[in-house]
Amino acid sequence: MLENYKNLATVGYQLFKPSLISWLEQEESRTVQRGDFQASEWKVQLKTKELALQQDVLGEPTSSGIQMIGSHNGGEVSDVKQCGDVSSEHSCLKTHVRTQNSENTFECYLYGVDFLTLHKKTSTGEQRSVFSQCGKAFSLNPDVVCQRTCTGEKAFDCSDSGKSFINHSHLQGHLRTHNGESLHEWKECGRGFIHSTDLAVRIQTHRSEKPYKCKECGKGFRYSAYLNIHMGTHTGDNPYECKECGKAFTRSCQLTQHRKTHTGEKPYKCKDCGRAFTVSSCLSQHMKIHVGEKPYECKECGIAFTRSSQLTEHLKTHTAKDPFECKICGKSFRNSSCLSDHFRIHTGIKPYKCKDCGKAFTQNSDLTKHARTHSGERPYECKECGKAFARSSRLSEHTRTHTGEKPFECVKCGKAFAISSNLSGHLRIHTGEKPFECLECGKAFTHSSSLNNHMRTHSAKKPFTCMECGKAFKFPTCVNLHMRIHTGEKPYKCKQCGKSFSYSNSFQLHERTHTGEKPYECKECGKAFSSSSSFRNHERRHADERLSA
C-alpha cells in the first residue's frame, strides 16, 4: 500500500503522509464492502471539495478533479478519463489513480501536474531503468533515485550544519530552518511553517476530533495507534527495555531518547547560551526562556509557564494532596516520575553511573550535575557579577544576594529566607526535630550538611585543597570561601553605603550597624548584642563573676 508513496518521496515529493494513508484505508474498506469486482459495478468521483485539506496545505487548488467510471465484466478494463490511460487492474483505487506503461508498472497521479511529467514518459514508451539491487523500475536514472534509497547514500549536504539528504528538495526544506523562512501560514492562529506537512499537522490539531477514548481515564486520541500506546500506561505493558539499566518504556522512541542519557549524546544545541539537549523538543521548550514566552497560564492564580507540563505540576499545588503515594513509607508525590525516582531510595537501585569515578546515582539529573564536578563546566552565569554555576538552582539562589529577595517566610516567627531548604531547616528549630544522627557518637542534627560536617571531626583528613596556595580544608565550601582571598571577590554589597564584603555573615553584621538590630540578648542583665561572638564573650564574663563570687 505504501510502495507508491515511498517512490514519490524518493524522487523528492513532500507528501502529507497521514492524509494519504487514511484515504487509502477508506478506499480499501469501501472496496471490501462492495464485494467481488467480478460481480459488481463501481463508480468513484474525486472532486475538489474532497481534496480541501490538500488545498489548505498547499495554498492553491489541485487539478479540477479526477473521475473514473468503469465496470469489470470479464475482460473489460477501467478507463481513466483525466488522461485516457487504461489500467489493467482496479488497484488504481488503492494507489490514488495510478497510470500505466507498457510493462504494467504504476505511478501515482493524485498529487499534481509535476508528477504527470513522469507519467507521460511512461505513456510515450520512454525507456525505463530497472535498479538491479531491488528490482524496482523508474523513469529516472536509478543511480539518482533508487540507489540512494537502497544504499543509504545522501548526496546533498548542508554547508551550515553538515547534515546530508537523499534528494535536493529535502535539502531545500532543511535550509529554511537556518534562515527562518516560513512559506505556509495557518490563518486561524497566524503561525508560520517551513513545510506543508507541518502545516497539515497543525490543521489537524485545530480541526480534527479525538474519537479514540481511553476507557480507563477518558483521555482522547486522534489515532487508534496512539490509544494503544497510551493503554500501556494502565496495563503496565512496557515492551521496550534498556539493556544498560533495565528501565522499560511503552514506546520505542522513548527508549531511543533514554539511551542518550547513558551515552551522553546531546545533538541539539542552543545558539544563544550553548546548552545542549538530547531531544529537539527540549531545545524548543528551552528557547522560550530566551524569548520570554510563557503561553501556559494558571487560571487560579495567574502564574504563567513556558511548558504545559510545568502548568500541570503547578495546578497540583492548588489541590489538597499529591496523588501518587509511596506504599512503603507513605510519602506522596505530584507525579508518577517523582514517585519512581523516590522508590529507588528503598530498592537501592542506582542505574546512572559516572564514567570518570564510578559513582552511581538514582536519577540521571544527579549524574549530569555530578559530571560537571569533573569537567568544571559552569553554564549558568550571573549577569550582575559574572559568577558562574554548575546548576541553574544555584544561580537563582545567588541572584537573590543581589536583589535581597527572601520569598520563603516562616509562619511561626516571620523570619524570611532566600532558599527554601534554609526555611525547611529553620522550621526544625521550632519543632525540635533532629533527624540526622551520627553513627559514631550519636549526636543528632537538624541538617544533613551539619551531619556531614560533623563526621569530618571524627577524621583528621582534609581532602579539599586550594589550588593557589595548597592550604587544605575539610569542607568544599571552605575552599570556595577561601578562594575569595586570592580573587578579591566581594559579592555582597550594602545598599545603604555601598561597602562590599567577601562573606555573607560579615555582610549581615554590617547591615545591623544601619538597622540597629541586636538579636542576641543576655538573660541575666538584659544587654543585647548584634553579633553572636560578642554575646558569647559577654556570657563568659558572667560565668567568671559567678566563679569569683
UniProtKB/Swiss-Prot annotation:
Q: For this protein, what is any one GO molecular function term?
A: DNA-binding transcription factor activity, RNA polymerase II-specific
Region spans: Disordered: 530-549
Gene3D superfamilies the record matches: Classic Zinc Finger (3.30.160.60)
Instruction: Write down the PROSITE patterns for this protein, in alphabetical order.
Output: KRAB, ZINC_FINGER_C2H2_1, ZINC_FINGER_C2H2_2
Where does it mainly reside?
nucleus
Task: Output one GO BP term.
Answer: regulation of transcription by RNA polymerase II
- Where are the zinc-finger regions (C2H2-type) in this chain? 156-178, 184-206, 212-234, 240-262, 268-290, 296-318, 324-346, 352-374, 380-402, 408-430, 436-458, 464-486, 492-514, 520-542
Q: Which domain of life is it from?
A: Eukaryota
Q: Which residues form a coiled coil?
A: none
Which Pfam families does this UniProt record tie to the protein?
Answer: zf-C2H2
Q: Domain KRAB: where? A: 1-42
Which UniProt keyword terms apply here?
A: DNA-binding, Metal-binding, Nucleus, Repeat, Transcription, Transcription regulation, Zinc, Zinc-finger
What SMART domains does the annotation carry? ZnF_BED, ZnF_C2H2
- Where does it live in the cell? Nucleus
Any one GO CC term of this protein is: nucleus
The reply to whether Lyase figures as a keyword in the UniProt entry is: no
What does this protein do, in the record's words? May be involved in transcriptional regulation.
| Entries under PANTHER family matching the protein | FINGER PUTATIVE TRANSCRIPTION FACTOR FAMILY-RELATED (PTHR24384), ZINC FINGER PROTEIN 977 (PTHR24384:SF247)
- Family under the similarity heading: Belongs to the krueppel C2H2-type zinc-finger protein family.
Q: By what name is this protein known?
A: Zinc finger protein 266
